[in-house]
Structure formats: structure tokens, C-alpha cells
Amino acid sequence: MPNIRVKENEPFEVAIRRFKRTVEKTGLLTELRAREFYEKPTTERKRKAAAAVKRQHKRLRSLTLPPKLY
């Protein structure tokens, strides 16, 4: 569990923002959502493979040159 020390004379909103940032960096919420329900190993593999294909297509789209517009 990430924890922060609230500095002296630090506004509450700033401390909350720092806490949210540390939680985001640790990936706690994404792991919590992933573990909320049981996912069979086969569906997990399929989901990860589909995400890898999607990432690869996205990377290829960014590498290709746009068509000439003349």
C-alpha cells in the first residue's frame, strides 16, 4: 500500500493528489480490477495475445508514411 507523509502546512488537496499519483505509479488499481473476478487461463492468454496484436498494428500504423496529398 503506497503511503505519503503530509508535509507541514501542506494543503489537503495537494496531499491527495500526491497519493493518487503514487497509487497510479504502482499500478494498484489496475491490478485490483484484474483480480476482481476470476479469469480462466485460456481467456487471459487470448486477451493478452489480442492486446499484443493490437499494439503491433498500432506501432506499424505509426511507422508507415502518410500518402502524398498532391
Curated annotation (Swiss-Prot):
Which keywords does this chain's UniProt record carry? Ribonucleoprotein, Ribosomal protein
Question: What Pfam families does the annotation carry?
Answer: Ribosomal_S21
Query: What InterPro entries is this protein classified in?
Result: Ribosomal_bS21, Ribosomal_bS21_CS, Ribosomal_bS21_sf
Asked if the Swiss-Prot or TrEMBL record annotates the protein with the keyword Ribonucleoprotein, the reply is: yes
Give the compositionally biased regions (Basic residues).
Answer: 45-61
Indicate whether Ribonucleoprotein appears among the record's keywords.
yes
Give the highest taxon in the source lineage: Bacteria
Q: Where is this region: Disordered?
A: 43-70
GO MF terms on file?
structural constituent of ribosome
Gene Ontology cellular-component annotations: ribonucleoprotein complex; ribosome
Q: Which GO terms describe its biological process?
A: translation
Record HAMAP family: Ribosomal_bS21 (MF_00358)
Q: Which family does it belong to?
A: Belongs to the bacterial ribosomal protein bS21 family.
Q: Name it.
A: Small ribosomal subunit protein bS21
* Source species: Dechloromonas aromatica (strain RCB)
